[in-house]
């Protein structure tokens, strides 16, 4: 019987162990998509407690606690203390066997705080106090955490109207780790509620210093902000969409639709789809002009619990996997850009695992030989960011594409304690490849190439792909 989470955790063969310990483990981290708060990095924020850094904003843990019968006040409530919240989390942890939260929890305790104890109600107070004592020191600040995990580059997620002042301040402070912005223009496509859209466009007008009275003005304002993001080092965009949009439209129609929504009138479903379709193309062309990589996270049904959405807002643990027939629209969208010669580097992330093979085959349609892996199948996202989800994504990409050209893992996280997800991914990758070698499916004579492949997927592919 193996010990829990020892040095060979998830590594079932000697070859897997060699690949991980001698190659994957030493690679720096490039976290090219995350949701860290840039101000915390700029301020080198010091966390007040383990609860703040671990439970604050972590909807994964909140979902588990709710499922375990924990009252909402211990998840998101203002009236309960940090210790009370942590105590309820510690009571929940023993019920998370086989959930990735169990592994993440103990991997984070071990790698960040050097704690090998299992978290449960009996150990909760001891672990809480030990972690809080360490968090009070400078080496456990926001920047200290990034250094601890050998992070080289992070890309945050930022709205076109964000000032990026914290990215600038961080860079000018001389901080050795790169923090770059990512262009996330979702709100310019959110035309379902006229008043919300107009409010957003007015903010875009203000920060761009361009008076917006029609569709062309809006595009000019977006281009100005796009240029500004590029000046601040941005190399990626990101789009959170339910599904792909590829309706037929004319520019005249889109101008009319803009006037209608900006004037306060609700759009028909057809008009909404046409506008979203047009914006995806325009934004894709902007990214192509700059040589950026566009990312698409699709397939989530968000804010399912309307009562809790009204109470807590978005991103609080009430989203789930959607079921959308989007392959044709995805193909049509990519083909439109490709036909114009304006399809930039692209990463596709699905939330429904049923689409693994869809994406793994779709990306092969638009590889053009200009660079290795120009169109990428993104790492297992959100609910698929776990051992089984990672393995299924890696296997689909291996069978239908080129795993060796994969740009690898990202945290997609708001937490400074989420970097062990890179370790988890690397261990999973090394275990798959190690088993293949020992099963005679990859020749032992090619071991040097396999070792390089592990280092590439862990670090070098992303470094070269994004030009960091």
UniProtKB/Swiss-Prot annotation:
SUPFAM superfamilies the record matches: Metallo-dependent hydrolases (SSF51556)
Classification via Gene3D superfamilies: Metal-dependent hydrolases, uronate isomerase, domain 2, chain A
Major enzyme class: isomerase
Protein name per the record: Uronate isomerase
Similarity-based family: Belongs to the metallo-dependent hydrolases superfamily. Uronate isomerase family.
Biological process terms in GO annotation: D-galacturonate catabolic process; D-glucuronate catabolic process
EC number from the UniProt entry: 5.3.1.12
InterPro entries, sorted: Metal_Hydrolase, Uronate_isomerase
Coiled-coil regions listed in the entry: none
Molecular-function GO terms, alphabetical: glucuronate isomerase activity
Catalysed conversion reaction: D-glucuronate = D-fructuronate; aldehydo-D-galacturonate = keto-D-tagaturonate
Pathway: Carbohydrate metabolism; pentose and glucuronate interconversion
Keyword field: Isomerase
A Pfam cross-reference name: UxaC
Organism encoding this protein: Bacteroides fragilis (strain ATCC 25285 / DSM 2151 / CCUG 4856 / JCM 11019 / LMG 10263 / NCTC 9343 / Onslow / VPI 2553 / EN-2)
